[in-house]
């Protein structure tokens, strides 16, 4: 059994990781890709990395100890590393495959011919038929005044998630409420959830595989109904808070049609590094998380997180080169904001390597209740919305604010 010892914990310190992969990648990537206009802000496909071959997955017994944060630029077969942007989709493929295999289960692919969609009285619906079974998902849309097409935010539970509605109202952003219970309940009874009607054999699937699948089907529905949706498909955001903040993060990581992800106070299992959290106090570690959200088999890593071949700075980095804003709240010990801070800094090095660090930001600030955005964080959210949903130029989104730094 491998455990994170005090000496190993010291090796996790982010600065060593930055020396290992971040700064090398930045030096090379900045010179090659300074013109960020060559790097897409969003894609028109759910997963552009699906063309890459399957990598060999090691058994639990074969996995080596990796006490430091894994290098997102290293190839899974050990053949070296590359920080070239042209190789990033292959890196994404390898990281996603490991995420599916070790943590959440594989997100099912759906063909357009398996879906029918429509919009009635500002309610979007999509019927997904697999193996003779049909599952219907619905999402209410709140439109601004005008004809559109409008930029849109998909909020978990509510149209803007837990973010203040006025931020989006005054900017003319449509608001789409994702009803996650239509896919899988918060507590999940394995094999008995709505999604299992379509995929009865996928009983190991975690909720953070199922819920992003549902969000992707809502985006499919918008594509299918076309102009009738009145949504600008190049400017879609997703947001949620707490467990829904994790949901938004996974959704953004696994669907490249999402231009902006705002993960609000996601805590353990979100941006937080499993490895760093293991060195902290009463926080949500891999062994103490909610296993309705993940594969049961991930429990094997509870006392040996150093053998997990990936970590969640890489989950966050799956969103690159698209935009990500991470919001944290250090007033709650369980959220392990030290882990969020270290992992966010490490993830941001991927964007930095491509010369687009302004597309990833983090703001960790206390003095407010959970899931209630304080006025002091409004500017960060508004800047990311203005730049990546409204397409405004000359907006400063170089956001790296964390009161964690003053609590050393």
Ranges and model annotations:
Residues 1-9:
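N-terminal secretory signal peptides that target proteins for export/translocation
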Residues 9-15:
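Sec-dependent signal peptide recognition
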Residues 17-25:
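Hydrophobic h-region of N-terminal signal peptides that target proteins for export
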Residues 30-138, 143-148, 256, 320-408:
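Alpha/beta-hydrolase-fold serine-hydrolase catalytic core, especially in secreted/extracellular enzymes
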Residues 149-153, 170-175, 233-235, 256-260, ...:
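Loop/turn elements at helix/coil->beta-strand transitions in domains of secreted/extracellular proteins
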Residues 155-228, 267-276:
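Cap/lid segment of the alpha/beta-hydrolase catalytic domain
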Residues 217-279:
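Primarily recognizes the serine-hydrolase "nucleophile elbow" in alpha/beta-hydrolase
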Residues 227, 264-315, 336-344, 352-357:
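Mobile cap/lid helix-loop segments that gate and shape the active-site cleft of serine hydrolases
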């Amino acid at each position: 059994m491998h455990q994170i010892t005090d000496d190993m914990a010291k090796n996790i310190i982010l600065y060593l990781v930055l020396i290992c992969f971040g700064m090398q990648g930045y030096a090379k990537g900045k010179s090659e890709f300074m013109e960020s206009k060559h790097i897409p802000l969003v894609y028109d496909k759910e997963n552009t990395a699906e063309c890459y071959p399957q990598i060999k997955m090691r058994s639990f017994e074969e996995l080596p100890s990796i006490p430091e944060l894994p290098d997102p630029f290293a190839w899974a077969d050990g053949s070296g590393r590359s920080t070239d942007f042209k190789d990033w989709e292959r890196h994404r493929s390898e990281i996603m495959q490991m995420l599916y295999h070790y943590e959440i289960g594989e997100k099912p692919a759906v063909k357009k011919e398996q879906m029918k969609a429509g919009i009635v009285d500002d309610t979007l619906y999509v019927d997904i038929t697999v193996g003779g079974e049909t599952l219907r998902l619905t999402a209410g849309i709140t439109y601004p005044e005008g004809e559109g097409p409008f930029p849109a935010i998909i909020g978990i539970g509510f149209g803007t998630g837990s973010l203040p509605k006025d931020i989006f109202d005054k900017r003319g952003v449509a608001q789409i409420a994702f009803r996650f219970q239509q896919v899988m309940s918060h507590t999940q009874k394995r094999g008995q959830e709505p999604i299992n009607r379509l995929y009865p054999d996928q009983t190991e699937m975690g909720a953070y595989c199922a819920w992003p699948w549902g969000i992707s089907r809502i985006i499919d529905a918008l594509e299918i109904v076309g102009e009738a949706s009145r949504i600008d498909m190049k400017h879609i955001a997703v947001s949620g808070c707490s467990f829904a903040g994790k949901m938004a993060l996974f959704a953004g990581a696994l669907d490249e049609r999402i231009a902006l992800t705002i993960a609000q106070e996601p805590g353990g299992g979100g941006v937080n590094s499993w490895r760093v959290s293991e060195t902290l106090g009463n926080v949500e570690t891999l062994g103490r998380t909610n296993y309705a959200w993940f594969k049961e088999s991930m429990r094997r890593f509870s006392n040996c997180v150093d053998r997990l071949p990936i970590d969640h700075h890489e989950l966050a980095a799956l969103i690159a080169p698209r935009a990500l804003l991470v919001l944290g709240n250090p007033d709650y010990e369980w959220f392990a904001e030290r882990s969020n801070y270290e992992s966010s800094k490490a993830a941001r090095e991927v964007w930095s390597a491509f010369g687009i660090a302004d597309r990833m930001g983090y703001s960790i600030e206390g003095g407010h209740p959970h899931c209630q955005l304080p006025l002091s964080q409004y500017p960060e959210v508004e800047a990311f919305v203005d730049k990546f949903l409204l397409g405004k130029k000359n907006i400063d989104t170089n956001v790296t604010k964390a009161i964690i730094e003053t609590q050393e």
